[in-house]
Regions:
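Conserved NTP-donor binding/palm subdomain of two-metal-ion nucleotidyltransferases/polymerases, i.e.
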Residues: 1-229
């Protein structure tokens, strides 16, 4: 669509914890495509012959997913207030369509309720979201909520404004080691938000690097085999 920017992802999202990721993939399979909503988009803003029907997730899933997407980036490198504003706007404007009981249970099953409460604390105390738009209480969340806010203001979007971080080395393996050390250190500092996600993130980095090297070796072997033919 003209004027609409679309960011394509190969997968919706993958969590670091194997158990949590299994739960999340099951949640995806539950609503897609059985409970998919459709919206009509056109350049005129009206329903006409050029209107395009686009599949969109139900509001309850979006309330979970937008939080998860922001949290994964927060744990990896940092986020700006923009990501939290996206989630806050959804909760404020679509709350009647969100099944609060289901959303709460999903956050608990994924081990991310504590992290969501920290996000909710900022949404209510700083961004003006009415507390009754959240599916969980905020009692006892001030400390972790303020810690999240401090990190957001210190690191910025994807950690781009974090003056404490040294530049990434240019070499391939030096860069990989830099990323691993930075991720491990950050996960250790933020483990109280989501212990299992923090524990498994460095492991997934190692697994991803190994997978890349295996695929490269396979590619080299396949190329040699084709050359011989």
């Amino acid at each position: 669509l003209k004027g609409v920017h679309i960011e394509n992802h190969r997968i919706i999202l993958r969590l670091n914890s194997p158990l949590a990721n299994r739960h999340f993939q099951q949640i995806i399979r539950k609503w897609y495509p059985q409970e998919t909503d459709y919206a009509l988009f056109s350049e005129t803003g009206k329903e006409d012959s050029k209107a395009v029907s686009i599949a969109i997730p139900p509001a309850t899933f979006n309330a979970l997913y937008i939080f998860l997407h922001a949290f994964v980036h927060f744990l990896n490198s940092g986020i700006g207030l923009r990501q939290l504003c996206d989630w806050t706007c959804l909760l404020a404007n679509r709350h009647k369509e969100i099944d609060a009981t289901t959303l709460l249970r999903q956050l608990q099953d994924l081990g991310l309720l504590h992290a969501a409460q920290a996000f909710g604390y900022i949404a209510v105390t700083r961004l003006g979201l009415p507390a009754n738009r959240l599916p969980f209480p905020l009692e006892g969340t001030k400390q972790i909520g303020e810690q999240l806010l401090e990190d957001i203001l210190s690191t910025g979007n994807f950690g781009q404004h974090d003056n404490r971080i040294k530049p990434r080395p240019k070499g391939y393996w030096a860069g990989k080691w830099y990323t691993f050390c930075r991720a491990t250190r950050r996960c250790n500092e933020l483990r109280q938000f989501a212990p299992y996600e923090a524990l498994w993130y460095p492991v997934t980095l190692i697994g991803g690097t190994i997978a890349i090297q295996i695929n490269r070796l396979k590619g080299v072997k396949d190329k040699k085999a084709r050359t011989k033919k």
